[in-house]
């Protein structure tokens, strides 16, 4: 049984109650955490319930789009950035998307039978940044650095991305009968103002990964230098290793044509 339930009614209160994260379990949409608590596999000392903390919503702010961590995934399905909307539409079903949150999806740990966190790939490709708080204070960092680092003791507050024109491409494979978990997905974006290419993959490892080597070489086979695919109930590492270069090549080709 949870010893204490915390119900902040503002972002400032949530930050204060979370502190450095010691002994605090974050409950956002609850699609992952609540079943674990109900099954007795997770027994939080403190449960921080964020549904009243005012951390939801999408807004424009000085040339940036800011997405609150508690924004439902469903709210992104008609987002102006099509690659983000496209990815959101393929996450689970509408009922789950109405509860699942952007911050929760980004931070979702890999399950025993599948990889999670589909939104990480388009957010990396779009150059998005995460604002979080917790141990060490508040910080803003690129999504790829946040995912690659130690997220223990971090509370995600919002995600921000620059409002610039981009050419984008995204594709992936998934099994509809496997709760829509991706076998592999690749997303790419090229900024119109600078020509910068960014590529990311999701569904193949415990978190989404930026494909830095491929960005430099434009060689799809180099993707396996950037990511080591894993085995799970959805697909084998060998199968992912075989299809990933094909998905990268398709993304590069589409970006060159547009």
For each feature predicted by the language model, list its residue ranges:
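C-terminal structural segment of proteins
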Residues: 1-258
